[in-house]
Amino acid sequence: PEKRNVVVVKDDPDHYKDYAHDKKIDXXXRFIITGNKVKTEKINRQILDNAAKYVE
């Protein structure tokens, strides 16, 4: 699979956190997987754990 960067959007949509550096993710936060521009309003822990595997 291609490498993708995973960033998490907290309360401020302009504030991004790299999931690789902050695993204390709120389950209600939003995130963007850069590269394919996938966006979601709700985070599922399993989705994040899977996405983290692609963080370069």
From Swiss-Prot:
Indicate where this protein is primarily found: virion
**What drives induction of this protein's expression?**
Expressed in the late phase of the viral replicative cycle.
Coiled-coil boundaries: none
The Gene Ontology biological process terms listed for this entry are: symbiont entry into host cell; virion attachment to host cell
Q: Disulfide bonds, which pairs?
A: none
Membrane topology type, per the record? Single-pass membrane protein
The answer to whether UniProt assigns keyword ATP-binding to this entry is: no
Modification(s) after translation: Does not contain disulfide bonds.
Whether Transmembrane helix counts among this entry's keywords is no
Keyword list (alphabetical) reads: Host-virus interaction, Late protein, Membrane, Viral attachment to host cell, Viral envelope protein, Virion, Virus entry into host cell
Query: Which superkingdom?
Result: Viruses
Q: Where in the cell is it found?
A: Virion membrane
**Which GO terms of the cellular component aspect does the record hold?**
membrane; viral envelope; virion membrane
Q: What does this protein do?
A: Envelope protein that binds to heparan sulfate on the cell surface and might provide virion attachment to target cell.
Name the family. Belongs to the orthopoxvirus OPG108 family.
Additional note from the record: Immunodominant protein.
Q: What is this protein called?
A: Envelope protein H3
This chain's source organism reads: Vaccinia virus (strain L-IVP)
Upper lineage: Viruses, Varidnaviria, Bamfordvirae, Nucleocytoviricota, Pokkesviricetes
